[in-house]
C-alpha cells in the first residue's frame, strides 16, 4: 500500500483526484501538469458557457475557470489531508501566473508561498522528507 511506503511514487490522471487518501509523509509532492479546464467538447459545459454568454455574462469565467478552480482545489487536497501534512504542489502550467484568470485560480488554492526557483523547491522537499531520494 502506498501509505506504508514513504519512498513510493503514484502517478495518476484527473480521475485519481477524487477518493485518494494518502495522509502523512507518503505524499510530499503533487505535480499538476496543466490547469484542469473542462474539455471543449463537453456538451453540458458548452451549453452552460453559451447560455451565460448569450445572457451577457462571461461564460469562460463563470463555467470554465470556476470548474478549473474547483478541480485545482481538489488536486491540491491530495497533498494536504491533515493539519500536520506538509509538501510541495508543483503546477507546471505557466498560465496560472501569466493569464488574466490566473489570480482567480490561485485564490482557490490553500495558503501557500509561491516560487519558480528549483533550488527553493528542492530545499523544501529536503526539509519535509529529511532527504531527497
Whereabouts are the PLM-identified features?
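ASCE RecA-like P-loop NTPase motor cores
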Residues: 3-133
Amino acid at each position: 500500500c502506498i501509505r506504508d511506503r514513504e519512498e513510493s511514487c503514484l502517478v495518476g490522471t484527473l480521475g485519481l483526484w477524487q477518493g485518494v487518501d494518502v495522509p502523512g509523509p507518503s505524499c510530499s509532492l503533487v505535480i499538476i501538469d496543466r490547469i484542469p479546464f473542462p474539455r471543449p467538447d463537453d456538451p453540458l459545459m458548452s451549453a452552460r458557457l453559451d447560455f451565460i454568454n448569450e445572457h451577457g455574462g462571461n461564460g469562460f469565467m463563470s463555467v470554465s475557470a470556476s470548474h478549473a478552480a474547483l478541480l485545482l482545489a481538489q488536486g491540491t487536497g491530495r497533498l494536504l489531508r491533515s493539519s500536520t501534512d506538509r509538501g510541495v504542489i508543483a503546477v507546471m502550467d505557466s498560465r496560472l501566473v501569466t493569464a488574466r484568470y490566473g489570480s482567480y485560480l490561485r485564490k482557490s488554492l490553500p495558503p501557500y508561498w509561491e516560487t519558480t526557483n528549483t533550488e527553493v523547491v528542492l530545499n523544501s522537499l529536503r526539509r519535509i522528507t529529511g532527504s531527497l531520494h
